[in-house]
A protein has these predicted regions:
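Duplex nucleic acid-engaging cores and interfaces of nucleic-acid transaction enzymes
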Residues: 2-136
Length: 136
């Protein structure tokens, strides 16, 4: 029995990808310049982090579980104004589970996705730098 468990753990893929889940992901074009993607589950969150360009911004609620959101400037990569940061933060807040919607303000962390690394746990990430925080 122990041998079978070890076999399963050793040969289980670290990142099981299912490209069919992209239809569940929320996408939006904001002001004709920004592409916003918000995950609806762990697979979407992993796909967002894995497939986003290094110039994109990544968003997540501080201290609460939530969807990941990524904003890409399709006109001027790497340039982001406050309006799109507020919009993406609001989408992340709206995606949160119970407990967060009862709060008047929540904190949303964001930073360039080049400082976000995936972990072996699907949908979880490691931040290489301290994020900026906005209160929504």
């Amino acid at each position: 029995l122990i041998v079978n468990i070890l076999y399963i753990n050793l040969y289980k893929p670290k990142y099981p990808h299912n490209n069919d889940s992209s239809h569940q992901m929320y996408t939006e074009v904001f002001n004709g310049e920004y592409h916003i993607r918000v995950g609806k589950n762990q697979q979407d969150n992993d796909n967002i982090v894995r497939t986003s360009p290094q110039s994109a911004l990544w968003f997540h609620l501080k201290d609460f579980p939530s969807a990941h959101a990524v904003v890409t400037n399709i006109v001027k990569p790497g340039k982001y104004d406050n309006a799109v940061i507020i919009r993406a933060s609001t989408l992340v807040k709206d995606s949160a589970k119970q407990g967060v919607n009862n709060l008047q303000k929540v904190s949303v962390n964001y930073l360039p996705i080049k400082n976000v690394r995936r972990t072996e746990i699907l949908g979880q990430v490691f931040l290489r730098k301290a994020p900026k925080t906005i209160h929504i």
